[in-house]
């Protein structure tokens, strides 16, 4: 795989959260031989044993449940180690999401869009009303999850610094993923512990 990328003229690659363990031997050989350099990796790279598909949200730093948090911590430190081993200076991670039990507001938004495929979401009043309600419900639930995300990142921060790996926080895929766009600047500012 890396030989093909090199043949296209690239010297650096980013390894994704879909990198399977069976590819590691070839990746490590390519790096050791100087054929390819790794610029960055993703959390859960390589994929944990038993996972065979791309899984950026396999474990989330926003979840406070002890067992899942322990898995997130374990499977975040491992890719940090791997990043350092292959010379990558950054590891990209997703920040988790807000969870809803029974009343996930996203369902209403999706239902409305499916029932009204012809509307323009930017101008349709019905859609805007449902979306505003969904955003308000999301906003009300964010604080507890957000605190957990920040605490989780703080748990791996020193380890990443020790290994010479920066943590990169990637954009969201879904409505309920963190951070919401309006909070991103404040989030980044809050990570600057050294001024």
Name every feature range the model reports, one short phrase each:
Residues 3-11, 33:
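A short, Lys/Arg-enriched amphipathic alpha-helix followed by its capping loop at the start of a domain
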Residues 9-12, 37, 82, 86-87:
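Short loop/turn motifs at secondary-structure junctions
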């Amino acid at each position: 795989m890396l030989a093909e990328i090199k043949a296209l003229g690239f010297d650096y690659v980013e390894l994704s959260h879909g990198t399977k363990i069976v590819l590691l031997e070839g990746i490590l050989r390519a790096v050791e031989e100087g054929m390819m350099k790794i610029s960055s990796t993703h959390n859960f790279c390589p994929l944990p044993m038993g996972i065979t598909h791309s899984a950026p949200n396999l474990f989330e730093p926003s979840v406070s449940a002890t067992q899942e948090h322990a898995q997130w911590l374990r499977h975040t430190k491992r890719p940090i180690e791997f990043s350092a081993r292959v010379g990558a200076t950054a590891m990209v991670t997703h920040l988790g999401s807000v969870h809803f039990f029974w009343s996930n507001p996203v369902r209403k938004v999706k239902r409305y869009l499916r029932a009204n495929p012809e509307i323009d979401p930017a101008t349709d009043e019905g859609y805007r009303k449902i979306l505003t309600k969904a955003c308000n419900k999301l906003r009300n639930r964010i604080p507890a999850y957000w605190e957990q995300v920040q605490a989780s990142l703080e748990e791996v921060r020193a380890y990443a610094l020790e290994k010479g790996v920066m943590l990169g926080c990637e954009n969201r895929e879904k409505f309920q993923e963190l951070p919401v766009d309006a909070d991103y600047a404040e989030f980044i500012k809050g990570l600057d512990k050294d001024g």
